[in-house]
Amino acid sequence: MKKYKFWGWEQADAKPITDTCKGIHKPADLYDALSHVWCADTCAPRLRDQWKPENMTLGQCSITAFLTQDLFGGKVYGILRPGGNYHCFNVIGNCRFDLTNEQFGDEVLSYDQSTEQFREVHFAKEEKRLRYEYLKTELKKYCER
């Protein structure tokens, strides 16, 4: 069995609620696909100059979490970070996982101190909505190849 670095991968057994992305049957499959799609253009602008392939999840959390919600359902939660931003992750039933926690290196995040996040709030920022749409389009292209 392949081991992953994202938090919660061992219990991330959620099933998709849609068949829009061929080959994605569990969150680990989505992580594998996104590993080919995440890029500087999908990274949050404030972190873009720090983005590199070796830290591919940097600045990708909210758009990835909402895209994951599109595919698997559930809710998106956020951990308040210094500076007032939220780091987003997914909760689907009893399954909790974070496809983008690798960006924090060895820092251990407290997932118990989190609040539900809503796409209407996050996507009120047009740049974030556009990054989400771009990520979704590129993922679909990758899955159709």
Could you describe each region identified by the protein language model?
Residues 1-145:
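A structural boundary/capping signal
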